[in-house]
From Swiss-Prot:
Belongs to the PsaJ family. GO terms for biological process: photosynthesis. May help in the organization of the PsaE and PsaF subunits. The keyword Transmembrane applies. SUPFAM superfamilies: Subunit IX of photosystem I reaction centre, PsaJ (SSF81544). Keywords: Chloroplast, Membrane, Photosynthesis, Photosystem I, Plastid, Thylakoid, Transmembrane, Transmembrane helix. This is Photosystem I reaction center subunit IX. One of its GO terms (cellular component) is chloroplast thylakoid membrane. It is a single-pass membrane protein. It is found in: Plastid, Chloroplast thylakoid membrane. It comes from Gracilaria tenuistipitata var. liui. Its main location: plastid.
Length: 42
């Protein structure tokens, strides 16, 4: 198997996990400072 392909497959889950953690943390902090934004948008 190609070495670059193995490096790609092993990097994407790590980057994805970091990105999802950052996104979840960002949404949690937005809701902490502005708790009514989600309910006002309905």
């Amino acid at each position: 198997m190609n070495n670059n392909l193995l490096k790609y497959l092993s990097t994407i889950p790590v980057v994805g996990a970091i990105w999802l953690t950052f996104t979840a943390g960002f949404i949690i902090e937005i809701n902490r400072f502005f708790p009514d934004i989600l309910s006002l948008s309905l």
